Swiss-Prot record:
The gene is U11. Keywords: Phosphoprotein, Virion, Virion tegument. Residues 612-649 have a biased composition (Basic and acidic residues). Phosphorylated at multiple sites. This is Large structural phosphoprotein. Transmembrane segments: none annotated. It is found in: Virion tegument. Disulfide bonds: none annotated. Belongs to the herpesviridae large structural phosphoprotein family. GO terms for cellular component: viral tegument. GO terms for molecular function: structural molecule activity. InterPro entries: Herpes_UL11/UL32. It comes from Human herpesvirus 6A (strain Uganda-1102) (HHV-6 variant A).
């Protein structure tokens, strides 16, 4: 961009000021120092005046344009430093050749020149190593000499340092100092080392100084942008809203040029919006002397929170001019609020007038004058003296960058009437607060700022947040109603519906009780000692006296919830088991749905277990225990269990849960929901009687394994040895429990289903046809008895094949011979003959019906799909 041909979008400035700014930007690289902060006349040219007043908004806009143009020129005219880097790599290769010739190069020195970033970070080590190497080559000693270069005169060293300083001040236009050795005093190698040291320092000075100025420019752009956009917030005018959105565009170093083009294209809109906003903003000006007190409306407690407080202003007029002060101010320029080295200053208070709600300021440095003023604390902005981004995070002023927007202070240099602007182009607010100042706000909410036209985080909020060391005494006017506080005791208790109600001081409580709710409307007098109504105090004491009311600590609330559930379970179990404990502590326990389900399940199992007189799994003769114990025994067991749980609960322990009990209850609930009823009881009892027919034979086999001889009835006496061998094969299993691991019932009868799948049982048909009055009274339909008789006769005569058992698909069957025997011994003999016959044959006929029996109980494999039903 040709700055002479393309006008810069400055506004409201005189022609001479615009020319001054344009010349500075056009000839930036020709200046001795390109730092904009070192040219105060340039930043002062951005000031816009309306008569004797300075327009803050328009001045900020021109400063923003100035910093944008400065960043643009700084980036466009940055020279290429790669030429210097190429010279550095060439000289480094010369040094490497010497080190290789001496066998001293281990690769460490060469790796430091691999890239620019690594070179910059390790240059201090490189410089020290080069000096030691040059001194060793020149003087033959490894002792480092405290000189910046090897065997150079002090004059040459001074000229080199001046050259480096000039390059640091103006990195856009620099000259390379020529280090030569016309009389060959040092030699080519020493001269190369000196050049390498100098070029390394020059490269770092150029790159680091440019990066520093670029960061300063970006920081000033962002801060000024936030100030300017803060002025334009909360307006309904389209131009102002549009300008506010444009100024809120997030910026980076790469986007500055595009943002500058946007401002140039929308110059008319932004200018008109700023003009309309400036016209609506009124500045209060008072003509006072330099040492007069400035009186303001005091901040009282009865002022509404949205009251517009007056802004502080200082008159620029002065009765007499101080030439010394004027000269000092012009030479010193005005500090910017982003000065990197300076720290924020605060108001020094001479005294605090609490009666008049005023603060007497002592030596408030405003525009170079030491004045005193009385001002409300809320009308003083803490943006004073902030000069660097590092100061934003100061412990005395913890404010974000966006919070530094427009200020309420209209400050000017009183010595000569100029707007006090530092080299950075930002106002200098040298207002100081002492750390021991105290302020009485009388309960007024200082966080509601209506006077500042800054960013959302500016204004009184920033003032209050900035008082890091101030004592703010606020009146406690917002006091909760006395009934909502309870200071009677420092304990917690539980209300009737298990809601924890804290009793600690100052903590409100709620009693979820109808009587208590009614008492709130009736009683309006409260206890002066506890802050609770007399009626509620009486109810609290009454609730504490109840057995169910337990005092708890606040930290034990999670544990108490678990204990409460255990207590409920114990109370419910007492009603179910008939225990002597009082089960009426829980309201509505007898009518709960869970209690009814438990009672129905217990009644169901009690009736079911009365009909079971043998344990199928254990198989012992005369054993009266089955899969589920009897009803009375179960009640005793449950009663004892819950008594133990009660003791454990009282001792603070968690009662152990019964997995079998949980599983049984879950199954009972499924049975009850399926509506099986009494038919399931009958079905289970009949099934148990059916499968217990073969227990006698199984018991004899087990007794033989313990030493009792197994006597098998056979007509072939000569085959005694083979019979004993077969018995030994039968008894190969050493563990009796392993004999029954594959025990199962297999049949195709629809009327008799396995009890382990009762929820899926098909009860669509009438069960009377398949029910059993007694296990020994069952008869097979048709000619079933005749077929079994023929099969047994074949066994007796020693036939090798068994007869087919044609069994109906819808009826259960039992061998008829087992029902006709008169004594148990005869029945055992018949079963033993069938077992022996199965083992001797090895396999059965393929047409026999597979079903559960003794052979399967002994884990005897039946080949194919045939088996003998027992």
């Amino acid at each position: 961009m040709d700055l002479q041909r393309h006008p810069i979008p400055f506004a409201w400035l005189d022609r001479d000021k615009v020319e001054r700014l344009t010349d500075f930007l056009s000839n930036l690289e020709r200046l001795d120092n390109v730092d904009l902060r070192e040219h105060p006349h340039v930043t002062n040219s951005c000031v816009v005046r309306e008569g004797d007043d300075v327009d803050d908004l328009k001045t900020l806009y021109n400063l923003l344009v100035l910093w944008l143009m400065y960043h643009y020129v700084l980036s466009k005219r940055k020279p290429d430093y790669n030429a210097i880097w190429q010279d550095i790599t060439k000289l480094q290769s010369v040094v490497n050749e010497y080190l290789n010739s001496k066998g001293l190069n281990k690769g460490i020195f060469e790796n430091m020149f691999t890239n620019k970033e690594k070179f910059e970070s390790q240059f201090s080590d490189i410089n020290r190593a080069l000096l030691r190497l040059g001194n060793f080559i020149k003087w033959g000693s490894n002792v480092a000499i405290d000189t910046p270069y090897v065997n150079l005169t002090a004059e040459d060293s001074s000229e080199i340092e001046n050259n480096l300083q000039d390059a640091e001040k103006n990195m856009l236009w620099y000259t390379v100092y020529n280090i030569n050795d016309p009389w060959d005093e040092n030699g080519y190698l020493i001269t190369s080392i000196n050049k390498l040291i100098y070029l390394g320092k020059l490269f770092l000075a150029l790159t680091q100084s440019w990066s520093k100025l670029e960061k300063v420019a970006m920081s000033q752009i962002v801060i000024t942008q936030n100030h300017l956009s803060g002025h334009l917030r909360r307006h309904d005018n389209f131009n102002i809203v549009y300008s506010h959105r444009v100024l809120q565009t997030p910026l980076t170093g790469q986007r500055v040029e595009s943002f500058l083009k946007i401002i140039t294209s929308d110059y008319d809109i932004i200018k008109s919006s700023l003009e309309s906003h400036s016209a609506s903003k009124a500045f209060s000006m008072s003509e006072i002397g330099p040492n007069s007190l400035m009186d303001f409306v005091p901040l009282r407690g009865d002022i509404h929170s949205n009251l517009t407080l007056p802004s502080m202003s200082i008159d620029t007029k002065k009765s007499s001019l101080d030439p010394a002060r004027l000269k000092k101010s012009n030479s010193r320029s005005l500090d910017s609020f982003l000065r990197m080295q300076r720290q924020p200053k605060f108001l020094e208070l001479d005294s605090v007038d609490n009666a008049g709600e005023k603060i007497l300021l002592k030596e408030a440095t405003l525009g170079g004058e030491n004045v005193k003023a009385t001002t409300p604390a809320s009308s003083v902005s803490l943006m004073s003296g902030v000069e660097s981004p590092s100061s934003f995070t100061s412990t005395n002023l913890d404010l974000p960058l966006s919070s530094f927007t427009s200020t309420n202070l209209d400050l000017r240099d009183k010595s000569h009437g100029n707007y006090k602007i530092g080299p950075s182009g930002i106002l200098d607010f040298n207002v100081k607060f002492p750390p021991n100042a105290q302020l009485n706000t009388n309960g007024v909410d200082l966080l509601q700022d209506k006077t500042s036209i800054g960013s959302p985080s500016s204004g009184i909020t920033d003032v209050v947040n900035g008082f890091a060391n101030l004592n703010l005494h606020q009146n406690k006017s917002n006091v909760s109603p006395p009934w909502s506080r309870n200071t009677a005791a420092n304990a917690d208790f539980l209300d009737p519906v298990h809601r924890f109600v804290p009793e600690q001081t100052g903590t409100p409580f709620v009693l979820n009780n109808s009587d208590v709710a009614g008492s709130e409307a009736k009683h309006t007098t409260y206890s002066t000692e506890t802050g609770v109504s007399p009626r509620n105090v009486f109810l609290i004491k009454d609730l504490r006296g109840k057995d169910g009311f337990r005092k708890q600590k606040q930290s034990d609330i999670p544990k108490s919830l678990t204990k409460e559930r255990n207590d409920k379970a114990i109370m419910h179990s007492r009603e179910v088991t008939g225990d002597s404990g009082d089960a009426t502590e829980t309201v509505g326990a007898r009518n709960s749905p869970a209690l009814r389900k438990i009672k129905q399940a217990n009644d169901f199992f009690a009736g079911l277990n009365k009909k079971n007189d043998r344990d199928v799994l254990r198989g012992g003769k005369g054993n009266s225990k089955d899969l589920h114990s009897g009803g009375n025994a179960k009640k005793k067991e449950m009663s004892g269990k819950f008594n133990d749980d009660k003791e454990m609960t009282r001792n603070g322990q968690e009662p152990s849960r019964s997995l079998m009990g949980d599983a049984r209850n879950a199954g009972d609930e499924q049975y009850i929901q399926a509506g099986l009823g009494q038919r399931v009881n009958n079905l289970l009892s009949q099934f148990t009687n059916l499968i217990s027919l073969g227990e006698k034979g199984i018991e004899d086999i087990l007794q033989n394994q313990r030493g009792t001889e197994l006597k098998l009835a056979t007509e072939n006496k000569s085959g005694r040895e083979s019979e004993e061998a077969n018995v030994e094969k039968i008894l190969e299993v050493s563990n009796p429990q392993d004999m029954f691991k594959n025990f199962r019932l297999q049949n195709d009868l629809d009327s008799v289903q396995s009890p382990f799948r009762l929820p899926d049982a098909d009860l669509s048909r009438e069960l009377d046809s398949a029910s059993f009055k007694d296990a020994l009274d069952l008869k097979l339909p048709g000619n079933g008895e005749r077929e079994i008789d023929l099969a047994l006769e074949k066994v007796k005569v020693g036939e090798t094949e068994t007869s087919d058992l044609k069994v109906g698909q819808d009826e259960s069957f039992v061998p008829a011979q087992l029902m006709k025997v008169e004594t148990p011994e005869e029945k055992d003999d018949i079963i033993e003959q069938m077992v022996l016959r199965i083992r001797q044959d090895g396999e059965t006929d393929e047409n026999t019906v597979s079903g559960p029996g003794v052979a399967e109980s002994l884990d005897i494999e039946a080949k194919g799909e045939s088996a003998i039903a027992s």
